Design a protein with these regions (language model features):
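Conserved helix-turn-beta segment of the N-terminal RecA-like "Helicase ATP-binding" lobe
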Residues: 1-26
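Conserved RecA-like ASCE P-loop NTPase motor core of nucleic-acid helicases/translocases
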Residues: 1, 12, 170-178, 205
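Conserved RecA-like P-loop NTPase helicase motor core
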Residues: 71, 207-292
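Conserved interdomain linker/interface between the two RecA-like ATPase lobes of SF2 helicase motors
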Residues: 116-189
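Post-DEXD/H (motif II) to motif III coupling segment of the RecA-like Helicase ATP-binding lobe
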Residues: 71-133
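Structural recognition of the conserved hydrophobic beta-strand(s) that form the central parallel beta-sheet
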Residues: 44-47, 89-96, 239-242
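Conserved helicase motor "Helicase C" RecA-like lobe of SF1/SF2 P-loop NTPases
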Residues: 179-206
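Conserved RecA-like ASCE ATPase "motif II neighborhood" in helicase/translocase motors
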Residues: 29-81, 242-244
Length: 292
């Protein structure tokens, strides 16, 4: 699966992949130690949800990189994080949104014994000034006040279509409140019909439903391959709807705007905005942030 015969690649997570993949600690141990015994290298890609499986595999880890490291402070993930911070030779943490704690019993990235000291911290304005990311542009849409918790799918559809039309957006990330809201929007309103009449495709992905493109269920690899292909196509118009699964970790340069349909914490908002301020075509000069 790779061009280097002396490099062995394994995935440790429950997601779909064509690479060697398992969450079984015994198989992880055998795979890693076979490579080690042959004097060859092994790279393991895992998730925070599956990191404890590598702890259980009891293998030697020389270097570990924690991407989106603010997730590592979560109660379910921190024990494995702390373990590898102690036993690995080199341990690095990367995040645009560090999560600190002022509570003794609640882990935070300011815990020096686990996370060490900050090696590099680059302010976002510097990244904008040096041309690495685009500045965000915030647009606030005034909505009528709805009493109670009743979900109005038709109103959601109207608000989204108006926002897309008013701002002339071709490639949009929509952050919904829940999977239920997404399914209601797609099945109990004219949202899909309105998109199709304007020449848009649509995509959705949640942990409950999996990935869907224009009504067809697909695997995750197909979803992300399509997302990247459409993002690079200047003629393609689409919306991608999610609850939380796309808030971080994706790099699609073509996404022009994010529309929030729910309240999010600081990290969730920052990470979602980060999806649309990536460099794109020369015509893309900012990432649009639409807030109801």
């Amino acid at each position: 699966n790779n061009s280097d015969p002396y490099l062995h690649v394994m995935h440790v997570h429950s997601g779909e992949t064509h690479y060697t993949s398992t969450t079984n600690p015994e198989k992880i141990n055998v795979y890693a130690n076979c490579a080690r015994n042959m004097g060859e290298n092994c790279i393991i890609f895992t998730t925070y949800h599956s990191l404890h499986r590598i702890v259980e595999a009891d293998i030697e880890v020389n270097t570990i990189y924690f991407d989106e490291a603010h997730n590592s402070v979560q109660r379910n993930f921190f024990p494995a994080t702390e373990h590898f911070s102690e036993v690995s030779e080199r341990c690095y943490f990367y995040t645009a949104t560090p999560k600190h704690s002022l509570t003794v019993n609640k882990p935070g990235m300011n815990w020096g014994d686990v996370y060490g000291q900050v090696i590099c911290n680059v302010p976002a304005p510097d990244l904008v000034d040096q041309g690495y990311i685009l500045p965000p542009k915030v647009v606030v849409k005034q909505l009528p006040l709805i009493k109670g918790r009743k979900v109005m799918y038709a109103e959601d559809s109207d608000n989204l279509i108006e926002t897309i039309d008013d701002n002339n957006i071709d490639k949009t990330l929509i952050c919904a409140r829940s999977t239920k809201q997404i399914m209601g929007l797609l099945s109990q309103s004219d949202f899909v019909m309105q998109l199709q009449s304007r020449g848009y495709s649509w995509m959705m992905i949640t942990s409950k439903t999996g990935a869907i493109i224009d009504g067809q269920k697909v695997d995750r690899e197909k979803f992300f391959d399509t997302l990247n292909t459409w993002g690079k196509d200047p003629e393609k118009k689409f919306v991608v709807i999610h609850h939380s699964i796309l808030s971080e970790g994706i790099n699609v340069s073509g996404l022009e705007a994010v529309i929030f349909m729910r309240n999010m914490d600081y990290i969730g908002i920052s990470q979602s905005i980060g999806r649309v301020i990536r460099l794109g075509s020369t015509e893309k000069t900012f990432g649009l942030v639409c807030i109801p």
